[in-house]
Structures are given as C-alpha cells and as structure tokens.
C-alpha cells in the first residue's frame, strides 16, 4: 500500500511543481523551478528530522518531494542559459548552494 501512497504523493508534488513553473516565465532566471527545488530540499530536511515512520518518510520525501523537485528540468534550463554566463552561474549557485542550505534549515527546525 505504501507504493500506492507514494505514487499519489509524487503526483501531488508534480502538480505543485507545475504551478510553480508557471510563475514568472518572463524572467531570465527560471524562478519556478528554483522555488520548487529549494522547497523540496527544505521539506526533505524537515521530514528527515521529524518523521519517525520509514514508510511515511518514503511517501513524503521520495514521493511528494521527488515529484516536486526536478533534476532534468534544472539541467535543461541550465543548458538554455549557457549564452548568458552571469545568469547561468547565478542559477547554478543558487540552486545547489541554496538546496544544501535549505536541507540544513529544514533539519534544524
């Protein structure tokens, strides 16, 4: 039954990511994907420290956060930003450093 809940949670995470991706499409920086990825990292940190059940953790972290965050879209957006090095490196640093900080902040809560 965990697999069913995990799949449902993943679908919800993907829907949330979709709505974030619609945000600020005119910006050079893909803010929707950045917000989705940073939120997913933060939530994984929160779940890591506050969810005792391995099954519930799998549903929330792997399911919901897995659907919310996106490595493939991130890399697609990065390759599109290669022509503007400043934006490319800003997005790269914000995503990876921000994700690491977000996980630690979630754990500290």
UniProtKB/Swiss-Prot annotation:
Domain of life of the native organism: Bacteria
This protein's UniProt keywords: Cell membrane, Ion channel, Ion transport, Membrane, Metal-binding, Sodium, Transmembrane, Transmembrane helix, Transport
Binding of Na(+), residues: 66, 69
Broad class of where this protein is predominantly found: membrane
This protein's GO CC annotations: plasma membrane
Alphabetical list of InterPro entries matching this protein: FluC
Inhibition and activation profile: Na(+) is not transported, but it plays an essential structural role and its presence is essential for fluoride channel function.
Membrane topology of this protein: Multi-pass membrane protein
Keyword Hydrolase among UniProt keywords: no
Transmembrane annotation, as ranges: 1-21, 29-49, 55-75, 87-107
One GO BP annotation of this record: cellular detoxification of fluoride
Localization per Swiss-Prot or TrEMBL: Cell membrane
GO terms assigned for molecular function: fluoride channel activity; metal ion binding
HAMAP family: FluC
UniProt similarity note: Belongs to the fluoride channel Fluc/FEX (TC 1.A.43) family.
Role according to the record: Fluoride-specific ion channel. Important for reducing fluoride concentration in the cell, thus reducing its toxicity.
Protein name: Fluoride-specific ion channel FluC 1
Provenance organism: Streptococcus pneumoniae (strain ATCC BAA-255 / R6)
Lineage, uppermost ranks: Bacteria, Bacillati, Bacillota, Bacilli, Lactobacillales
